């Protein structure tokens, strides 16, 4: 499968009379966009704002982040099974408004939406302080149930991303990247001396607002299966969850999965990148056993020499992570796991809720319990009053002067387990 990604570099976002991209500037017809989003069921009100890198702006509570994309050649469309019809994605050509993002906010859905600061120390912990953000402030009808509230914000964000993405349909990209995956037999014949490596992509599916969607299907209801890596770039996997914002994968991150990107970069040089296995993180033990069994079985079936396993979330999914690692290793496949830690504010507690001696190659993306003080911002987009109750906050987090003392758990993307962030380590 071959996919061309045409990146159109966006240097600024402005409101204008027509939604278009011109000389690197994304112009948005605010009234037209609000009108299109206001027809979504159960929406009470919609407004738009813009937040740029370096501005004294805080966005909270952040529900999701979406990168504007449009399918210009080939089968399928963006966000298949949800926005476009159900058809296999991941081939043809897709244009991306690189540097732009749609950020959804509104009244808090559960208690785990996050914070994005566009400047100050908090900006160093979120990748979305570097994007030009079109913020959609969406308020649902009064008295709506929580799961419907989440769905409303999710659909507003996805529709907003598709609307903005259309502005790039006829624009000549600034760069075109090509991603191509051979069949298993073609790859083995082409690279007989390279180790066969697969990527096990764990999806948050605990339920109760902790959901992920694959081609529109609630991933709680799937068994592990194989995807072409390029399918995720067209939005085959969507975030629908309100898990702690530091380590949940927003839809933007699913479309820009750095694990997939790095494995493609190594393909044909250091490794033979065979493909992606997606699996879930259900709460029942029988589901965990079934999914980890199937994941290990698929790794063996593909003849992998090595596998990288990434987690989403923490706590209960730590068990899924360790079960996957243990069983894949038992099939003779060398395994590396990528996670984050909840090791207490002093970093001295057990990092994961589960462990096994076979989990001996671990990448940590940071300790979510680390405490930070965010300075006051001149402007807040959204609702600041939820700071004390979101995950990572506590009674008194929001101070009288507008500063915030929180664990970095509250910052969107701070310890992203795919490595989509700015925390790093150096070896000496």
UniProtKB/Swiss-Prot annotation:
One of its GO terms (molecular function) is glycine reductase activity. The modification Pyruvic acid (Cys) is found at residue 242. It is an enzyme of class 1 (oxidoreductase). Its EC number is 1.21.4.2. The peptide chain is cleaved into beta and alpha chains, and the alpha chain N-terminal cysteine is deaminated and oxidized to form a reactive pyruvoyl group. The active site is at 242 (schiff-base intermediate with substrate). It comes from the Bacteria. Keywords: Oxidoreductase, Pyruvate, Schiff base. Pfam families: Gly_reductase. It catalyses: acetyl phosphate + [thioredoxin]-disulfide + NH4(+) + H2O = [thioredoxin]-dithiol + glycine + phosphate + H(+). Coiled coil: none annotated. InterPro entries: Gly/sarc/bet_Rdtase_B_asu/bsu, Gly_reductase_pB_sua/b. Heterohexamer of two alpha, two beta and two gamma subunits. Component of the glycine reductase complex, together with components A and C. PB is substrate specific. In the first step of glycine reductase, the substrate is bound to component PB via a Schiff base intermediate. Then the PB-activated substrate is nucleophilically attacked by the selenol anion of component PA to transform it to a carboxymethylated selenoether and the respective amine. By action of component PC, acetyl phosphate is formed, leaving component PA in its oxidized state. Finally component PA becomes reduced by the thioredoxin system to start a new catalytic cycle of reductive deamination. This is Glycine reductase complex component B subunits alpha and beta.
């Amino acid at each position: 499968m071959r996919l061309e990604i045409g990146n159109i570099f966006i240097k600024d976002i402005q409101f204008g009379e027509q939604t278009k991209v011109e000389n690197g500037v994304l112009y948005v017809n605010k009234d037209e966009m609000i009108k299109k989003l206001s027809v979504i069921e159960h929406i009470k009100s919609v407004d738009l704002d813009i937040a740029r890198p370096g501005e004294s702006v805080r966005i909270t509570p952040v529900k999701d982040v979406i990168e504007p994309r449009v399918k210009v050649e080939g089968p399928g469309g963006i966000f298949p099974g949800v926005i476009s019809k159900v058809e296999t994605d991941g081939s043809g050509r897709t244009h991306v408004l690189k540097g732009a993002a749609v950020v959804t906010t509104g009244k808090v859905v559960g208690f785990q939406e996050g914070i994005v600061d566009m400047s100050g120390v908090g900006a160093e912990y979120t990748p979305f302080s570097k994007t030009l953000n079109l913020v959609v402030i969406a308020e649902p009808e009064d008295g709506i149930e929580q799961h419907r509230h989440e769905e409303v914000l999710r659909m507003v964000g996805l529709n907003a991303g598709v609307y903005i993405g259309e502005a790039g349909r006829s624009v000549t990209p600034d760069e075109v990247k090509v991603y191509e995956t051979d069949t298993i037999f073609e790859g083995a014949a082409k690279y007989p001396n390279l180790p066969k490596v697969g990527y096990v992509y764990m999806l948050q599916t605990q339920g109760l607002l902790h959901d992920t969607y694959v081609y529109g299907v609630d991933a709680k209801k799937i068994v592990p299966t194989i995807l072409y890596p390029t399918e995720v770039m067209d939005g085959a996997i969507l975030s629908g969850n309100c898990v702690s914002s530091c380590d949940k994968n927003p839809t933007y991150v699913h479309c820009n999965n750095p694990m997939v990107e790095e494995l493609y970069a190594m393909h044909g040089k250091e490794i033979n990148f065979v493909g992606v296995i997606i699996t879930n993180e259900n709460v029942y033990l029988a589901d965990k056993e079934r999914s980890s069994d199937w994941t290990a079985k698929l790794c063996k079936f593909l003849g992998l020499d090595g596998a990288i396993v990434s987690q989403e979330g923490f706590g209960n999914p730590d068990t899924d992570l360790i079960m996957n690692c243990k069983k894949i290793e038992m099939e003779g496949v060398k395994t590396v796991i990528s996670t984050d830690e909840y090791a207490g504010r002093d970093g001295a507690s057990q990092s994961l809720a589960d462990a096994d001696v076979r989990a001996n190659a671990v990448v940590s993306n940071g300790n979510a319990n680390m405490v930070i003080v965010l300075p006051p911002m001149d402007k807040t987009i959204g609702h600041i009053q939820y700071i004390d109750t979101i995950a990572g906050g506590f009674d008194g987090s929001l101070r009288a002067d507008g500063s915030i003392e929180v664990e970095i758990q509250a910052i969107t993307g701070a310890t992203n387990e795919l490595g989509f962030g700015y925390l790093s380590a150096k070896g000496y």
